[in-house]
């Protein structure tokens, strides 16, 4: 069974200008539009920002900023990363969820970032990356075809 990708990549046409603006800032920490200095990163992240990494670990803003100081991020374009399937949903006044798929050299991940527009500019409230197995369908894991979990005897 294949998924209907339109469900995952639909953006209300009214939001397309916002999507274009935020798409230029993703993947976060890896584009010049997002920023390149600690001051840029501090400005672009809310004081209570946190993220859940592709490994499932949770990281605070302070930890992320210290890590970026020690290991400056690579530019996504210069290392051949490709993002696609961008979609945007308004969560509330001036708050948006952008989702997309990121293909890096060594892995494929689904990304989600919650952005907020402020008088000082865009900032992120939360970010998550989830590793995707190449064998998995968007709708459900391929292993479910053989033995759907809801049919297992308990």
Model-derived regions: residue spans:
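A beta-strand edge to alpha-helix "cap/lid" segment located at domain peripheries
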Residues: 2-43, 48-154
């Amino acid at each position: 069974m294949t998924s209907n990708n339109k469900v995952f990549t639909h953006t209300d046409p009214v939001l397309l200008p916002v999507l274009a603006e935020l798409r230029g800032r993703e993947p976060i920490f890896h584009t010049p539009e997002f920023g390149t200095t600690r001051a840029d990163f501090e400005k672009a992240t809310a004081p209570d920002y946190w993220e859940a990494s592709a490994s499932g670990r949770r990281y605070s803003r302070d930890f992320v900023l210290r890590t970026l100081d020690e290991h400056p991020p690579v530019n996504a374009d210069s290392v051949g990363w490709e993002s696609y399937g961008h979609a945007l949903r308004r969560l509330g006044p001036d708050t948006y969820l952008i989702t997309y798929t990121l293909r890096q050299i060594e892995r494929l991940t689904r990304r989600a970032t919650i952005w907020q527009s402020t008088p000082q500019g865009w900032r992120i409230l939360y970010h998550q990356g989830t590793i995707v197995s190449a064998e998995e369908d968007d709708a459900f894991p391929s292993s479910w075809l053989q033995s759907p979990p809801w049919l297992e005897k308990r």
